Amino acid sequence: NYKVAVVGRFKAGKSSFVNELLDARLASEDTNPETAAVTTFRHGDEVKATIRFLARDEWTKIQSLYQQDPRHIDAHRVLKWHELGKTRKNKDGEMEEGYDLQALEKEYIRDGGFSIEIRLANDGTKKAEADFRRRLKEFTTGTKPHHCMVLGIEIESPAPILDGGVLLIDTPGLGDTERYRVELTEKVVDDVDVEVAEVAAARP
C-alpha cells in the first residue's frame, strides 16, 4: 500500500480536496471542525464505511488518565466526552439536553473492540448519498461525543485514484482547538509515504 495523508489547518479545505480526488462527497465538509477522526479511504467494489471503536480496556485506561491528570493530551478526549454530555445552548441560544453517555458506552465500547458498517445504497440517488453522509457524520463530527470513542474509520470506494493500493487519509485539522485530535494527525503523518498539505487561500 501507498499511504497519502491530506493535512492542513482547520477550514483549509482538506475534506473538500479529498472529495475532489474521490469524485464523490464521502468526506464530511462543514464550517465547524468536522473531521474529528482519522479516516482512511481504500479501493473497494462498493462504497462502505467501517467504524472501529476503542476496546474497553483502552477506553478505561483513557478514563483513568483523565482522573489522574486532566491536562494530559490523551485525557482531553474524555474531557470533550463529558462536555458533550452536558446540557448546553445550541446555535439558536436555546438549551438542549446533552447526550446519554452511559448509553453510548454500552452500545459501542466492548471487550476486544467493536465495529459497525455503513453501506451506500447502490441505487445512484442523491438521497442515498446524503443518507450515507448523514450516518457517517455521526461518528466524524466534533460536535457529537461519538467521535471520542472512535479508534479509526475506513471507507472503501471504487474511485480510480485508490486503485493499485493507494490509501488516502483524511485527518483532523492541525489548528483544531482539541489538542488530542491534532496529536492523531501528527501520529498519522509519521507513518505515511506522502503528505499533501492543504493551505487556505488568502482573501484579496
What are these regions (language model features)?
Residues 2-204:
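Globular "head" domains of long coiled-coil molecular machines
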